[in-house]
Amino acid sequence: REIATVMARLLVGDDAQLRGVSCYDPSAGTGTLLLALAHQIGEDRCSIYSQDISEKSSEMLRLNLILNGLSESLPNIRQGNTLLEPAHKEANGTIKKFDYVVSNPPFKLDFPEYRDTLAADGIRFWAGVPNAVKQIKPKPTMAIYTCFIQHVLNSLSSRGKGAIVVP
């Protein structure tokens, strides 16, 4: 929780003039980073957007939004694979841009079944997709966080700010 608070303070500072800003987390879990950001900005001055592969985590985030006065953002909470099928897009199909993006992505994950699909998307994953599969028992993992870093950068508006927890 302390890391979330520090990230929010660094991104937002004490800017009381912010209004109508968008905040996004592509690997939100239960929303700790997003809630810290909303508290720093002011719950009535921001909209929350998220995606997480876990339905259970997404449901917990919805509950957290209700408990923290952010129920207007409930329709923006999506479950799914952010890297393979990002849920938040503009009308023209491009990745939606946000004022603030925070993320604590998975660091290592077994994703060889869709690695080549991600690698083929040279626009979104312009810095590449991990090749090396490290043998870690019981199954191989790859440094998937590098893909999330690229997704975060692609999701920032031209004046947007982001913060990512990395190993």
Locations of the language-model features?
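Conserved S-adenosyl-L-methionine
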Residues: 2-103, 108-112, 116-119, 166-167
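Conserved Class I SAM-dependent methyltransferase catalytic core
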Residues: 134-167
